[in-house]
Amino acid sequence: MPNDLVVVKANSLIEANYRLSIDEIRILALTIGTMDPKSNQKIFDFTVADFVREFPEISQDNAYKQIQAAIKRIYDRSVKTEDKDRVTEFRWVSSRTYFKKEGRFRIAMTDEVMPYLTQLKGQFTQYQLKHIAYFNSVHSIRIYELITQYRSVGSREITVEKLKEWLQVENKYPRFNSLNQRVLEPAITEINEKSDLVVEVEQIKRGRTIHSLNFVIGSKKRTAQKIEEVAKRPVFPHKNKYGKFVKLDKQNPKMSNHEYGLWARDCLKILEDHYTDITKVTNEDLRNYWVFLAGNDSNRSKLGSKSDFLNELKKRGYKLVDCELVKI
């Protein structure tokens, strides 16, 4: 079995309604991770050793019984998808096999589920299995998949009602505080501690009621890089050292006063001494670069021209309006 297994699912399957235990989800994730997304193969074998290797917190002593019990339950599980025109319900697997004394299992996926797992040409989400390998909560995995769908966007807003439906707790936790304490907070903590994502949750009210949640999604790698760079860059000198009226003309930086020009020149030198690659410059410092270069035609940067910094911001989904960062 290959390392770094990748789970690929149609978005409609991620947003489907189904109830599975943590071990059932692990088995399906392991099975889907071994699939060739371009193939129609429906039968998959795996061993106890495979399962324990991919999910290290599983005890080798109890793994066989856990898998056997979970596969037995999966056989009776179904998934329900819904669109504007219809509701469809189908089973995950069509057969299950135990190879006695071999520590090996085989499951066959149903014809109905296969279009949601293979031959996908769009509207799908993928992630590495290792990023959910240490999760101990079904809710953590489901929320992880739901926000991974919107990872490139950077945020996803979900109504509380819809989230409860997806998490199969629509008949529990009538008070949001209970849902937050028992489901959301533990899941977000687990995602932040054990996966590749960093997630913050913003509560959106309608009147006095929490109506929806905005999941702000970041990558640990990018966040760590940004924090490291910001921490390392020396702070700019205080403007008071250059006079009482150090002012930027935001509509036309060239019209900024002389004191601002002196301050900007020294700040630009700090940036030049710190950065060696434009792709590693933080968004705020890309803005600073542009402003400092725009204020005086004699100012230069080894990283590029004003347009180069604007283009880098555009790649990241930002533009400058009156010298301020604005999301495109």
From Swiss-Prot:
GO biological process: DNA replication initiation
Annotated organism of origin: Neisseria gonorrhoeae
Keywords from the UniProt entry: DNA replication, Plasmid
Name this polypeptide is given: Replication protein
Similarity annotation: Belongs to the initiator RepB protein family.
Gene Ontology terms, MF aspect: DNA-directed DNA polymerase activity
InterPro entries hit by this protein: Initiator_Rep_WH1, WH-like_DNA-bd_sf, WH_DNA-bd_sf
